[in-house]
From Swiss-Prot:
Native source species: Mus musculus
Name this polypeptide is given: ABI gene family member 3
Gene3D superfamilies associated with the record: 6.10.140.1620, SH3 Domains
Modified residues (Phosphoserine): S216, S219, S343
UniProt key word Phosphoprotein: yes
PANTHER family: ABI GENE FAMILY MEMBER 3, ABL INTERACTOR FAMILY MEMBER
Domain (SH3): residue spans on this chain: 309-367
Length: 367
C-alpha cells in the first residue's frame, strides 16, 4: 500500500511541480539574460559587468541542473514503482493460471476414474418383462374379393396370333411376290387392308395388332413398288379395296381354303455398269500437302537446353508473363521440360528461355 501511495504522490504532485518549476526558470533566465545584455552595453566598466554576468550564469545553471536532476529522480522512482507493480500483477496472474491448471487436472483425473470404473449389472435382471401386454385382435377369416381388380389393366383381347394364321402377310417380310398367286376360290390375291383401331368389346383386334398389321401392309406395298428390270415384267398389283370402318373378323378356317404360299423374294434390278472412278488430278510439287514442321524441341536431336532427366515434355496453351524473378515467361506453343510438380498446381521446368516456375494449367502434355 505504501508503494502505491508513493507512486500516486509522484504522479499527482512531485513530477508536475518539478515541470512547473522548470517552466518558471525558463522565463526567469530570459529576464536575467536581457538584464545582463543591457547592463553590459550601458556599463562604463566592462570588466565588472562581465563578472556580474558570469555570476548570474553560474547561479542559473546550478539552479536548472538541480531542478532537472530532481525531476529525473522522481521520474525514475515512478518507473521503478510501476515495474514493481507490474511484477506483482504478473505473479498473481501466474498463480491464478497454475490454480486453473490444477483444477482442470483434478477434473480430468476424476473423469478418467469414472470411465475406468467397472459397471457390474446384477445377475437377476437379465429379462425385464413389459408392464402390460398389448391386446391381440382375434382373427376373422374374410372371403377374397376380386372385384377390386376390375379397374386395373384393359380388357381388349389380342388376336395378332390368329391374324397371322388367316392369310395376313408376314410382319417380318418386306418383299412382294413376283407373280400373282391365284386363290383357291378363284379370286385375286387379297391385299391386306389397314386395320383401324377397334372398339373395347371382346372379339376385336387390339391396338398392338392393328399397328403391326398397318406396318406389315405398308412394308408390303413399299416392297411391291420396286422397279423391275427390262427383261422381267411383273404384273400390275390390283388396287386395295376401300377401307371399311371396322374390319370384319377373318373367315373360319376350313379344309377347302388354303393359305397362299409365302411371297418370293423380289429380284433386285441389275445395277448399271459401274464406271471406274476418275484418277486423281496430278499434284504439282508446290501443291503437295507437306506435314508442318514439329515444334522446337521435338527433333531427332535434343537441344542443348534439355536437361538429362525430367518428368515429361509439355506444350504451353496460353502466353504467360512472369510475376516474380523465379518464374518463366513464355508464349503459346513453347516446349517446357517439367522437372518437378507441386501440390498447389505449380510446376518447375526448363525451357529455351531458362529455368523457373510456371502454372500447370497453362500447359498440356505433348503427343
Amino acid at each position: 500500500m505504501a508503494e502505491l501511495q508513493q507512486l500516486q504522490q509522484l504522479q499527482e504532485f512531485d513530477i508536475p511541480t518539478g515541470r512547473e518549476a522548470l517552466r518558471g526558470n525558463h522565463s526567469a533566465l530570459l529576464r536575467v539574460a536581457n538584464y545582463c545584455e543591457d547592463n553590459y552595453l550601458q556599463a562604463t566598466d566592462k570588466r565588472k559587468a562581465l563578472e556580474e554576468t558570469m555570476a548570474f550564469t553560474t547561479q542559473a545553471l546550478a539552479s536548472v541542473a538541480y531542478q532537472v536532476g530532481n525531476l529525473a529522480g522522481h521520474t525514475l522512482r515512478m518507473l521503478d514503482l510501476q515495474g514493481a507493480a507490474l511484477r506483482q500483477v504478473e505473479a498473481k496472474m501466474s498463480t491464478l493460471g497454475q490454480m486453473v491448471n490444477m483444477h482442470m487436472e483434478k477434473v480430468a483425473r476424476r473423469e478418467i476414474g469414472t470411465l475406468a470404473t467397472v459397471v457390474r449389472l446384477p445377475s437377476n435382471q437379465k429379462v425385464i418383462p413389459p408392464e402390460s401386454l398389448p391386446s391381440l385382435t382375434p382373427y376373422h377369416r374374410k372371403p377374397l374379393n376380386f372385384a377390386c381388380l376390375d379397374d386395373i389393366g384393359h380388357g381388349v383381347k389380342d388376336l395378332s396370333t390368329q391374324l397371322s394364321r388367316t392369310g395376313t402377310l408376314s410382319r417380318k417380310s418386306i418383299k412382294a411376290p413376283a407373280t400373282p398367286v391365284s386363290a383357291t376360290l378363284g379370286r385375286p390375291p387379297r391385299i391386306p387392308e389397314p386395320v383401324q383401331l377397334p372398339a373395347v368389346p371382346d372379339g376385336k383386334l387390339s391396338a398392338a395388332s392393328s399397328a403391326s398389321s398397318l406396318a406389315s401392309a405398308g412394308s408390303a406395298e413399299g416392297a411391291s413398288g420396286i422397279p423391275q428390270s427390262k427383261g422381267q415384267v411383273a404384273p400390275a398389283t390390283p388396287p386395295p379395296p376401300p377401307v371399311a370402318p371396322v374390319t370384319p373378323p377373318p373367315p373360319p378356317l376350313s379344309a377347302e381354303v388354303f393359305l397362299p404360299p409365302p411371297p418370293l423374294e423380289v429380284s433386285q434390278p441389275p445395277l448399271e455398269a459401274e464406271l471406274p472412278l476418275p484418277p486423281p488430278p496430278a499434284l504439282e510439287g508446290d501443291e503437295l500437302g507437306l506435314l508442318p514442321p514439329p515444334p522446337p524441341g521435338f527433333g531427332p536431336d535434343e537441344p542443348s537446353w534439355v536437361p538429362a532427366s525430367y518428368l515429361e515434355k509439355v506444350v504451353t496453351l496460353y502466353p504467360y508473363t512472369r510475376q516474380k524473378d523465379n518464374e518463366l515467361s513464355f508464349s503459346e506453343g513453347t516446349v517446357i521440360c517439367v522437372t518437378r510438380r507441386y501440390s498447389d498446381g505449380w510446376c518447375e521446368g526448363v525451357s529455351s528461355e531458362g529455368t523457373g516456375f510456371f502454372p500447370g494449367n497453362y500447359v498440356e502434355p505433348s503427343c
